[in-house]
Amino acid sequence: MRRFTVAERWIHRGTAALLGTTMITAAFLYLPMLSEIAGRRDLLVTVHEWSGLAALVPVLAGLVSRAFRADLVRLNRFGPHDRGWLRATLRRRPHPSGKFNPGQKMYASLAAGAVLVMTGTGLIMWFTSLAPLVYRTGATFVHDWGALLLGALVLGHIWIASNDPEARGGLRTGFVSRAWARRHHELWADSPEE
């Protein structure tokens, strides 16, 4: 079954590469022991700032794709089956879900919100002449804690994905087996137009 189009797969890859670059450079800028190893702080700052801004580009460019827009709608809607999935998951019982389960929907919402907050606070920190010191101080606080939250979310995302080779294959090739789809996304497998 087709799970993702070529455009959707490239949006994911582009966003992952740019956010990964942003997070790695952030670690080298923030952690003293890594800062000492890297040196060239000015270069790291420049790469960090531009990769952070560029991380928005794949998603914005992806809005041209009808399939991507349809998946954004799916990610933005919680239905009765989603509430059932959450209750069943807390009790460690199986429950059908659509193309995206509620865990994926919550991750997408939190990650998107965190990226927007990180971009806004980063811009305040970057263009210091545009904001008073109190705003820059608050932006730094929010940016640092937001980075920690986003890092934890991304590591959790990678951890869960590492335990599902067929899901990773679906993101690499665009296709998953019908058996996998029925096991993990039954409502979508039975009605791909969900």
List the predicted regions and their residue ranges.
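Membrane-embedded alpha-helical bundles that constitute the cytochrome b-like, heme-associated redox core
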Residues: 1-194
